[in-house]
Amino acid sequence: MNNEKELKKEETSVENKEKKVATEEIKKEKKDYKKIIQDLEKQIESCQKEIEFQKSLRNADIANLTKKRNEQEALVRKYGSSNLAEDLIKPIDLLKKVVETPTDIPELQNYLMGFKMIISQIENAFETNGIKAMGVKAGDEFDSSFHEANESLENSGMESNKIVSVISDGYMIHDRVLIHAIVKVAK
């Protein structure tokens, strides 16, 4: 019986040791899992920060693209009629010269009066859209930004670099030159 008791004690002792070893292994595994979980949480946090950073970059890109598109749309609205205006200005300038031709024929004077009214309406439409004549005159200073010299004249009786005569007026669309004024310049 003593043997049996000792055997039971030993069995209990072995069982306790096995339980203790198993408990220690579980605790160790639990620590390992906690470390793995902490590492994964750090990775998740790092990924979330990277996602937020990338989102902020994309939002900035979208804002910049929107701003650029709005600026381009504004430019198109502001200067979009340039080609049409260029095509219309030359015939209108010719019509102005025809209208300025003196005549004694009353019927022709009536037509010329009607053409002057049409020219005036077209010029008003141009001005409404930011297109206007430069109003270059003889005696103005020549500026290659606005004027195109068709001819340089010596002994014109004017100072050098002054406009002697205007062949055709120039036009601006808002702050840009649409058509340069064609002029004769004193040397």
Swiss-Prot record:
Parts forming coiled coils: none
Keyword Phosphoprotein: no
Pfam families, sorted: GrpE
Lineage: Bacteria, Bacillati, Mycoplasmatota, Mollicutes, Entomoplasmatales
Protein name (database record): Protein GrpE
Cellular component aspect of the GO annotation: cytoplasm
GO MF annotations, alphabetized: adenyl-nucleotide exchange factor activity; protein homodimerization activity; protein-folding chaperone binding; unfolded protein binding
Domain of life the protein comes from: Bacteria
InterPro entries: GrpE (IPR000740), GrpE_coiled_coil (IPR013805), GrpE_head (IPR009012)
PANTHER family given in the database record: GRPE PROTEIN, GRPE PROTEIN HOMOLOG, MITOCHONDRIAL
